[in-house]
From Swiss-Prot:
Name the record gives this protein: Deoxyuridine 5'-triphosphate nucleotidohydrolase
Catalytic activity: dUTP + H2O = dUMP + diphosphate + H(+)
GO molecular function: dUTP diphosphatase activity; magnesium ion binding
First-level EC class: hydrolase
InterPro entries: dUTPase, dUTPase-like, dUTPase-like_sf, dUTPase_trimeric
Cofactor: Mg(2+)
Keywords: Hydrolase, Magnesium, Metal-binding, Nucleotide metabolism
Pathway connected to this protein: Pyrimidine metabolism; dUMP biosynthesis; dUMP from dCTP (dUTP route): step 2/2
Amino acid sequence: MTIHHDLSPTLNLIRLANGEGLDLPAYESKGAAGMDLRAAVDEAAPLTLLPGKRALVPTGFIFEIPEGFEGQVRPRSGLAFKNGITCLNSPGTVDSDYRGEVKVLLANLGEEAFVISRGMRIAQMVIAPVTQMRVAEITEASETMRGAGGFGSTGV
């Protein structure tokens, strides 16, 4: 018999006025890596994203991401495939010391206008560990089998 203990860190959220009535960000399945983020746009004024345009879409929440972690904002595959809606600067990083509203930078790469309505799942956030490294300047790089070979250097 396996006994599971929940030792997961807690993600504290502050609901802003524009987030009233929205579901909390949530994992939609037991194996989901990312929690869905919803649009906190005005119900009476949905946002229309024209082809080739971008918009910063509010989520209605401030995230208190635990120290040692980051939030990675990523596109939802269904929106990208079906409508050409994606996140720019993907993944977008939400640092653990950021205390403003989380917003999602969406772009319409499709051929038709796309309407973003209140509560629509617009992106996902993956919480991931962060390592901060010491930085040291050196005069020569160590040798490796690959060397300075870049794009395509290991084969197609």
